[in-house]
Amino acid sequence: MNYFVLIAVACLLTAGTESKKDGYPLEYDNCAYDCLGYDNKKCDKLCKDKKADSGYCYWAHILCYCYGLPDNEPIKTSGRCRPGKK
C-alpha cells in the first residue's frame, strides 16, 4: 500500500512538467531555417520566438539550431524538405 501512495505522489509531481529538446526547428514545409552568413543573432531570436532557451547558426549545415525547444515544436528528424508546399 505504501508503494502505491509513493508512486501516486511521484506521478502527481511529474504531471504537467514540460520537457525540452534540442534540434533544428522546422518551417511549414519540413525545411529547417537557414542562416546564410552565419547569423547567430537571427537564429537566437528565431529560437527564442519559438520559446527555446537559445539558438545559434550551425556552420556545417548553415541551419539554425535551438536549445531547449518545447516538446510541441517540430524539429528536423527525417523526411525531405518540400519548399513551397503548405
Curated annotation (Swiss-Prot):
Gene Ontology cellular-component annotations: extracellular region
Protein's GO biological process: defense response
Summary of the tissues where the protein is detected: Expressed by the venom gland.
Major place of residence: secreted
Location of the protein in the cell: Secreted
Keywords, comma-separated and alphabetical: Amidation, Disulfide bond, Ion channel impairing toxin, Neurotoxin, Secreted, Signal, Toxin, Voltage-gated sodium channel impairing toxin
Database matches in InterPro entries: LCN-type_CS_alpha_beta_dom (IPR044062), Scorpion_toxin-like (IPR003614), Scorpion_toxin-like_sf (IPR036574), Scorpion_toxinL (IPR018218), Scorpion_toxinL/defensin (IPR002061)
Family membership: Belongs to the long (4 C-C) scorpion toxin superfamily. Sodium channel inhibitor family. Alpha subfamily.
Name the UniProt record assigns to this protein: Toxin Tpa4
